[in-house]
């Protein structure tokens, strides 16, 4: 199930990059995140950064361990997480055009195994709208933080 969202931000690419890569303090910027726990910090760069992220999901805390798999400064980073028979892949990217600077995020959940595949059918219909709403809220929270600086 692929979910995508984007917002246009009145700010510089470097300011947006600083906001989206401040993983350690993401709970202060993004209202949907309850808690961040850093697990592993690479010697340099972002690739290999690993953390546990706790969000409220249907009224209950849900924690998933994420890590950055690829990144290009001021352009994008990709993350991976694995939980309950699913692999979650996301890309957060910054692009510039005549219309301004756009922050985009895409999240793809891939079921692993027959049970997860069967669960993904009914959950896809229910969860896609919830996921898109949460993703857009995350992007708008980042937009607010960058535009207030």
Report each predicted region and the residues it spans.
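Hydrophobic ligand-binding cavity/cleft-lining segments
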Residues: 1-46
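Hydrophobic beta-strand positions in extracellular immunoglobulin-like domains
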Residues: 9, 55, 107-109
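Short, surface-exposed charged micro-motifs
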Residues: 6, 67, 89-93
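Glycine-rich portal/gate segments that line the openings of hydrophobic small-molecule binding cavities
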Residues: 37-86, 97, 102, 137-149
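Amphipathic alpha-helical segments that line or abut small-molecule/effector binding pockets
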Residues: 14-17, 136, 140
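Beta-strand/loop substructures that line and gate deep hydrophobic ligand-binding cavities in soluble
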Residues: 82-136, 144
């Amino acid at each position: 199930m692929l979910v995508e969202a984007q917002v246009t931000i009145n700010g510089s690419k470097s300011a947006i990059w600083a906001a989206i890569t401040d993983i350690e303090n993401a709970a202060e910027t993004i209202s949907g995140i309850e808690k961040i726990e850093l697990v592993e910090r690479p010697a340099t760069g972002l690739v290999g950064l690993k953390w546990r992220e706790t969000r409220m999901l249907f009224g209950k805390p849900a924690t998933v361990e994420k890590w950055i798999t690829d990144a290009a400064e001021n352009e994008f980073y990709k993350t991976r997480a694995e939980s309950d028979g699913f692999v979650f892949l996301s890309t957060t990217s910054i692009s510039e055009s005549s219309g301004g600077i756009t922050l985009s995020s895409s999240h793809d959940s891939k079921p692993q195994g027959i049970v997860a595949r069967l669960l993904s059918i009914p959950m896809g219909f229910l969860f896609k709208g919830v996921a898109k709403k949460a993703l857009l809220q995350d992007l708008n929270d980042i937009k607010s933080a960058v535009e207030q600086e």
